[in-house]
């Protein structure tokens, strides 16, 4: 099961970073390259504990849907979203926000399993891990740019 970890320093308070990371609107802006839109559940504003959002996006030329639920929430320190349905076998995405010097260290841990058994593991090694890592890094940079 691959685990992607990212970390970025943002010159903003943890509360600002936390709210930007859970903003449906900022998520859609940051993923415009995949035409990602919220089509179900919470569709705008700040997602809360227990809420779901259904995303529709184009990855690898295929329009897909994925529903995630917020399963842990400790503002402004941490929240977790987990896949309810979608293309992965499963995923858990933990977002952490640590006060550091004149800002916040924003850390992501994206723990996932691909479908299709051995073929999914091969896809992870060949391209999926790097693809997902780039999506997370781009999103984090977008949040950083907006917050600063």
Task: Give the ranges of each region predicted by the language model.
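Short, surface-exposed coil-to-beta transition loops
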Residues: 3-5, 63-67, 90-93
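Glycine-rich portal/gate segments that line the openings of hydrophobic small-molecule binding cavities
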Residues: 28, 38-85, 105, 138-146
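Beta-strand/loop substructures that line and gate deep hydrophobic ligand-binding cavities in soluble
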Residues: 80-134
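Hydrophobic ligand-binding cavity/cleft-lining segments
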Residues: 1-44, 48
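Secondary-structure boundary/capping motif
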Residues: 1-3, 78, 93-95, 136-140
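Short strand-connecting beta-turns/loops that link adjacent beta-strands
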Residues: 13, 75-76, 100-103
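Generic structural detector for well-ordered beta-strands
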Residues: 7-11, 38, 56, 69, ...
């Amino acid at each position: 099961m691959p685990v992607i970890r990212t970390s970025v320093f943002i010159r903003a308070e943890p509360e600002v970073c936390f709210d930007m990371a859970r903003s449906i609107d900022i998520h859609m802006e940051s993923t415009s390259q995949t035409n990602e839109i919220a089509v179900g559940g919470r569709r705008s504003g700040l997602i809360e504990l227990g809420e779901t959002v259904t995303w529709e996006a184009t990855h690898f030329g295929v329009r897909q849907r994925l529903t995630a639920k917020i399963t842990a929430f400790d503002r402004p320190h941490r929240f977790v979203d987990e896949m309810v349905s979608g293309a992965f076998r499963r995923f858990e995405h933990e977002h952490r926000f640590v006060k550091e010097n004149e800002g916040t260290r924003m850390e992501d841990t994206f723990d996932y399993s691909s479908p299709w058994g051995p073929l999914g593991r091969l896809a992870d090694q060949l391209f999926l891990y790097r693809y997902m890592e780039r999506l997370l890094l781009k999103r984090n940079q977008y949040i950083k740019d907006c917050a600063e």
